[in-house]
């Protein structure tokens, strides 16, 4: 009898889990647009460049706690993020041109 009760307990637990999963599925999911994602990525690139510029200014002014290796790392991060942004732009332009050249 205890095995049956154990199985019934597991079944009721699975049913409760399924009910909560259905309840979560019915909640409206936030939608993020492509333009919103692109704008957020551009903001992150801008923030990275601003942080690198600020670090470089602090190092140039001789503020304590700002090491050259940190400045160089931040500058490289900014450079890589900018190059990534340029490559994404190039791919988007190429995709747009390909779509526009398609025959309807």
UniProtKB/Swiss-Prot annotation:
GO terms for cellular component: bacterial-type flagellum basal body. GO terms for biological process: bacterial-type flagellum-dependent cell motility. It is found in: Bacterial flagellum basal body. One of its GO terms (molecular function) is structural molecule activity. The keyword Metal-binding does not apply. Pfam families: FliE. It comes from the Bacteria. Keywords: Bacterial flagellum. Belongs to the FliE family. This is Flagellar hook-basal body complex protein FliE. It comes from Escherichia coli O139:H28 (strain E24377A / ETEC). The gene is fliE.
């Amino acid at each position: 009898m205890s095995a049956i009760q154990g199985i019934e307990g597991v079944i009721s637990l699975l049913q409760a889990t399924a009910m909560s999963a259905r309840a979560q599925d019915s909640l409206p999911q936030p939608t993020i647009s492509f333009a919103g994602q692109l704008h957020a990525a551009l903001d992150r690139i801008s923030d990275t460049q601003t942080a690198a510029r600020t670090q470089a200014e602090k190092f140039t002014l001789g503020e304590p706690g700002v090491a050259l290796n940190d400045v160089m790392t931040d500058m490289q991060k900014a450079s890589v993020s900018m190059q990534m942004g340029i490559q994404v732009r190039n791919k988007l332009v190429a995709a747009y041109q390909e779509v526009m050249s398609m025959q309807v």
